[in-house]
């Protein structure tokens, strides 16, 4: 057990996400003591029998990951276009077998890519540079969010990151209500995978009004995934990249970085953000 924070184990409900191992510490190199590490395994997504992508991920919440990935990558537009899903655990990793509608599978074969990435990587193996940034439909302006309500959400973020609190090794993605409460969240060793899990959960729960908060930086792919799923506001704890800002500007997504209590850097479309408690 992590001797510094044994209480954190009470919040880890899925023991497959972390494992205790004997380790040496700088202050005592002669003996080992148990500490917790996050699990990381290869997860293959297979559509209608054809391997599409291999991601390094935390081995939990895999069905909603597959749903979120399928939605955020534009493979499907609705969960109704997925007819079935099986998760196969093997010696070398995990395979998620997804059955698509025939129309969606035909479209997927036309633009099929096959990649084996680093943790959460979604670019490695893309066949053409033009495939990196997909065309995105402009998002509507249907909601606002109070920056004052963001502070409360930031304080709650650790509640959806128990493995991260225990190991210091995961990213989190959370769905914020307009009131600044966290409706739900997911964590993973890969920031893209954490976001895909959240987007899959959002589709299942039919969350509409609100925003996404991620514990990581905002890359272009995080923006692309969020926008593809119709998310209008994306908050990141760390910075955004130039390509992320360009993509967000083009698709009308409100992108905010350095989201910390009492501060934030707004990169694009600030008109969705308001000062003061929206409920006041």
Swiss-Prot record:
It is found in: Cytoplasm. Pfam families: FdhD-NarQ (PF02634). One of its GO terms (biological process) is Mo-molybdopterin cofactor biosynthetic process. It comes from the Bacteria. GO terms for molecular function: sulfur carrier activity; sulfurtransferase activity. NCBIfam families: fdhD_narQ (TIGR00129). Belongs to the FdhD family. This is Sulfur carrier protein FdhD.
């Amino acid at each position: 057990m992590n001797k510094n924070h044994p209480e954190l184990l009470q919040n880890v409900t899925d023991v497959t996400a972390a494992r205790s191992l004997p380790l040496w510490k700088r202050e005592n190199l002669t003996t080992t003591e148990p500490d917790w590490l996050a699990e990381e395994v290869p997860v293959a997504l297979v559509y209608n029998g054809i391997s599409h992508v291999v991601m390094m991920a935390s081995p939990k919440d895999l069905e909603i990951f597959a749903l979120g990935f399928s939605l955020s990558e534009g493979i499907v537009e609705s969960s109704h276009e997925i007819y079935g899903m099986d998760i196969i655990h093997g010696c070398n990793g995990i395979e998620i077998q997804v059955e698509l509608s025939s129309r969606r599978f035909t479209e997927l074969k036309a633009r099929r890519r096959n990649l084996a990435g680093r943790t959460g990587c979604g670019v490695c193996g893309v066949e053409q540079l033009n495939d990196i940034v997909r065309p995105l439909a402009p998002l509507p302006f249907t909601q606002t969010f109070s920056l004052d309500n963001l502070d409360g959400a930031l304080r709650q973020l650790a509640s959806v990151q128990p493995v991260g609190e225990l190991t210091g090794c995961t990213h989190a993605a959370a769905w914020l209500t307009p009131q600044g409460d966290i409706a739900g969240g997911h964590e993973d060793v890969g920031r893209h995978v954490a976001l895909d899990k959240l987007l899959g959960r959002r589709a299942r729960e039919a969350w509409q009004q609100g925003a996404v908060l991620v514990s990581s930086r905002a890359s272009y792919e995080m923006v692309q995934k969020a926008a593809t799923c119709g998310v209008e506001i994306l908050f990141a704890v760390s910075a955004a990249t130039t390509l992320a800002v360009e993509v967000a500007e083009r698709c009308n997504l409100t992108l905010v970085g350095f989201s910390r209590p009492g501060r934030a850097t707004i990169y694009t479309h600030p008109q969705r953000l308001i000062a003061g408690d929206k409920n006041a």
